[in-house]
Design a protein with these regions (language model features):
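Sec-dependent N-terminal signal peptides
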Residues: 4-12
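N-terminal post-signal-peptidase region of extra-cytosolic proteins
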Residues: 39-50, 79-80, 98-104, 147
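Extracytoplasmic/periplasmic, Sec-exported soluble proteins
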Residues: 54-57, 75-86, 90, 150-156, ...
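Extracytoplasmic/secreted envelope proteins and their assembly/folding machinery
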Residues: 83, 87, 91, 95, ...
Length: 218
């Protein structure tokens, strides 16, 4: 059984009713051709602003995980309560893994402080494929396959965008996207639970915390 998931190190959204405005303000347009394959992770795509040196930062400010909603404000296969639970779990787990790696956690913007922002951008169901497909979203939008019927196993794709910012100026430093493959499948009529998402977050948080720690100054 397989479930394909896209999860990123970080992307921009600051929550609540301000989601729409914040997306257009924070996520400046960057063509997918500007992203390069990561040397350490072939499934990861990275955009880095020219001249940026992450070693000048030695603390991180972790924003809450947010969700880009559909026009009707509803998620496909995920309830609002589960969204809140997933958001809290993401924040606590990622912060814990960062601390394990020796990364200092800031509580406010400041010099040498990097802001990490993350948001889930889309859910999609597709028929299983033996090859991991390119899951990079072409735009910031929900993309749900609505014509799926029956109880055949389907792969779940969870899209996310990512960015690291200077905490004081808001300048974009790095944006990251990556495709991950888990070991489960789902069916269209089975709701995706917070517990299933937490297993994915555990793996992601540990690997991304180490990756970030390796690139920051100490």
């Amino acid at each position: 059984m397989k479930k394909v998931v896209m999860v990123a190190v970080a992307a921009a959204l600051l929550g609540g009713c301000a989601v729409k405005n914040q997306v257009s303000h924070s996520l400046q347009a960057i063509p997918l051709t500007a992203f390069q394959q990561s040397e350490s992770n072939p499934n990861q795509r990275v955009y880095k602003e020219p001249g940026v040196d992450l070693r000048q930062y030695n603390e991180v400010l972790l924003d809450p995980l947010q969700f880009i909603r559909q026009e009707n404000g509803q998620w496909y296969l995920l309830t609002a309560n589960e969204q809140n639970q997933i958001g809290r779990y993401y924040h606590d787990k990622f912060q814990s893994e960062l601390i394990k790696q020796g990364v200092k956690i800031a509580t406010a913007p400041g010099p040498k402080v990097m802001r990490i922002q993350a948001a889930v951008t889309n859910f999609d169901l597709t028929r299983p494929d033996p090859k991991l497909r390119d899951l990079l979203p072409a735009k910031i939008a929900i993309n749900v396959t609505r014509e799926v019927i029956g109880k055949e196993p389907y792969l779940l794709k969870v899209g996310s965008m990512a960015q690291l910012l200077d905490s004081r100026s808001g300048k974009l430093l790095v944006r990251v996207m990556d495709a991950r493959e888990s070991t489960d499948t789902t069916h269209k009529d089975e709701p995706i639970t917070a517990e299933e998402m937490e297993e994915m977050i555990d793996q992601w948080a540990a690997s991304r915390a180490k990756q970030l720690a390796d690139n920051l100054g100490r």
